[in-house]
A protein has these predicted regions:
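Short alpha-helical transmembrane segments in multi-pass integral membrane proteins
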Residues: 1-18, 72-138, 184-242, 298-363, ...
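Hydrophobic/aromatic residues in alpha-helical transmembrane segments
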Residues: 16, 32, 68-69, 108-109, ...
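Transmembrane helical elements of multi-pass membrane transporters/channels
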Residues: 13-32, 132, 166, 199-203, ...
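Transmembrane alpha-helical segments of integral membrane proteins
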Residues: 176-177, 397-406
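N-terminal transmembrane alpha-helices
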Residues: 3-34, 38-39, 52-67, 71, ...
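Helix-terminus/linker motif at the lipid-water interface of multi-pass membrane proteins
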Residues: 23, 27-45, 113-120, 176-187, ...
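Small-residue-rich hydrophobic transmembrane alpha-helices
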Residues: 44-107, 140-159, 259, 272-336, ...
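Short runs within selected transmembrane alpha-helices of multi-pass transporters and secretion channels
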Residues: 65, 133-152, 159-167, 192-208, ...
């Protein structure tokens, strides 16, 4: 225990700012939904459609940016700030090209929005909101890339503060532009989109300014300025980033398709499913935050070639995530019905949602452990296996099992939710197995 205590403290110190920043994102999402919903039902429906379309893009961009963190942490572990700064330049190129490819696809899809089965009366709301949110993705990519760089230097507080202030600006912008306060025009859903765009521009510029002007990053700036762009180095970043982006994209896609299947049952089932997934994000938020903190620790020790400490850092992260999963499970068991009533008072929806509390609890440990060992792998930068593990777990197991349990077995939403557990409990041991394979190549001294 005494050997693990420093690792507990360090992982918590890194993870808590990430968690606080993510709580801010969730609060902003709730505020957006409530304000748009109170403005007009058509605006809420249009926002839900566009946000669901861009949700997968957001996860792909976010996952892709995660490839940079362990590379930077490894350089920092060796004291190579010049090299870490140069790596940021290559990562910005790689992330920019990846985002442009995704936005090109989304631009093509824009011209087929009217073929996606949405009510015709929503299209005048959907089209401008789609354009604004799509444009904001460029700034999301820039913020994510630079934030993963600062996180990799063990500075997780900077990203937290910028996220929190950006979210506050977004909420203020919503009030001014959705409803038209004072000299500001009443723009409804478009106002919410513009507020999101402006807040994302602010966050991107703010984190760039921190790296460009803060004294802490002076040595990194020297490396950034002195390092020329290199296609070889950019491709190297891509090989470490693309597997993580695709892994998170497939995981997100499995959850999205599970929602679609719930909608095949009826509207109350879809509503209940969405409510429980939203509640479940509270657990996911903490698992991923502290998993990211553990990943930074692992990468730092990999950079030092200290594999004994890699093992200790991973074990400490596992203990923290198990404790978080236990706390989340108890919270959902005790307060689940209260959380559900916060979202809806419809008795049919509430009844279905309450029946999903136990399946929600079941998947907490699978989720925590797959996040633990996925992040441990990410910390070692041995990430190629993450693609096939995600494909097997989420595409081969989760989605077909959801259909089989939900429909032929007549378990409906309960079956679809249980299939999520099957996917997560498939991913967790596979990630663990791959991490152990990496450790066997580097026996502790």
């Amino acid at each position: 225990m005494s050997k693990l205590l420093p690792h507990y403290k360090a992982t918590l110190r890194l993870g808590i700012p990430i968690a606080i920043g993510q709580i801010g994102v969730i609060i902003m999402g709730f505020a957006d939904t409530m304000m748009v919903g109170r403005y007009a039902t058509e605006a809420l429906a249009s926002a839900s459609f566009v946000n669901s379309v861009f949700n997968l893009i957001s996860f792909l961009i976010m996952g892709y940016s995660y490839g940079l963190t362990p590379l930077v942490s490894a350089h920092c572990g060796r004291g190579e700030k010049h090299e870490a700064g140069g790596l940021l330049k290559q990562a910005l190129m790689a992330n920019g090209l990846f985002t442009l490819v995704l936005l090109t696809i989304m631009t093509v899809l824009y011209f087929y929005v009217d073929c996606m089965g949405q009510p015709p009366q929503l299209l005048p709301h959907i089209r401008p909101y789609y354009i604004v949110i799509g444009t904001s993705m460029l700034f999301v990519a820039l913020f994510n890339a630079v934030r993963q760089f600062t996180d990799g230097t063990s500075d997780t507080a900077t990203g937290m503060w910028i996220l929190l202030t950006g979210n506050a600006l977004n909420i203020i912008g919503n009030v001014l532009l959705i409803y038209g306060v004072g000299p500001f025009p009443e723009l409804g859903l478009l106002g919410a989109g513009l507020s999101t765009l402006f807040s994302r521009i602010y966050m991107a510029l703010a984190i760039v300014a921190v790296v460009a002007f803060r004294k802490r990053y002076a040595a990194y700036r020297t490396g950034f300025n002195a390092t020329p762009l290199s296609w070889r180095a950019t491709r190297f970043v891509n090989t470490k980033s693309l597997p993580i982006g695709l892994q998170m994209g497939m995981e997100s896609g499995a959850f999205t398709f599970s929602c679609i299947m719930a909608g095949w049952i009826d509207a109350p089932s879809l509503a209940a499913f969405q409510v429980m997934l939203t509640i479940g994000t509270l657990g996911f938020l903490f698992y991923y935050s502290f998993g990211s903190g553990m990943s930074i620790r692992v990468a730092t020790f990999v950079g030092l070639n200290d594999w004994h400490q890699v093992r200790l850092a991973t074990r400490a992260g596992q203990h923290i995530l198990c404790a978080m999963a236990t706390l989340s499970s108890l919270t959902f068991l005790i307060l689940g019905p209260t959380f559900i009533h916060f979202f809806t008072h419809d008795p049919t929806v509430v009844g279905i949602a309450v029946s999903l509390i136990v399946p929600l609890i079941i998947y907490q440990f699978g989720d925590a452990m797959q996040i633990c060992y996925a992040n441990a792998l990410r910390g070692t930068s041995q990430v190629m296996s993450m693609m096939w593990i995600a494909f097997v777990s989420y595409i081969v197991v989760n989605i077909p099992a959801g259909y089989f349990l939900g429909f032929p077995c007549h378990l409906k939403t309960t079956g679809i939710f249980l299939a999520i557990s099957l996917g997560l409990f498939t991913a967790a041991p596979l990630f663990y197995w791959q991490f152990q394979k990496v450790l066997k190549k580097h026996p502790a001294e």
